[in-house]
Amino acid sequence: QKPGEAVILEQSIDNDGLGQYTFGFKTSDGLIRQEQGVVKNQGTENEALEVRGTITWLGADGKDYSINFVADENGFQPQYTQ
């Protein structure tokens, strides 16, 4: 591993093939991502993918930072936390 390069320490992926999935990973530089998706109103004209998740990382100041988000028919809606 070269300086500044991260490696994946953990990874999980589960897709039920019916419109739901989860995935996540953790890297050696402290990045963590978790995400869940589901197809809402499946089979209708209002069908839409809804994704919810969290991204957490270690800042240069040593503090953890996070973004919780929803992405759906209303767009990407992030909420930043520290």
UniProtKB/Swiss-Prot annotation:
GO molecular function: structural constituent of chitin-based larval cuticle
Annotated ranges, domain Chitin-binding type R&R: 18-82
Pfam families, A to Z: Chitin_bind_4
Chain positions found as Pyrrolidone carboxylic acid: Q1
Entry superkingdom: Eukaryota
Gene Ontology cellular-component terms listed: chitin-based extracellular matrix
Keywords from the named record: Cuticle, Pyrrolidone carboxylic acid
Keyword match Disulfide bond: no
Known role: Component of the abdominal endocuticle.
Protein name per Swiss-Prot or TrEMBL: Endocuticle structural protein SgAbd-6
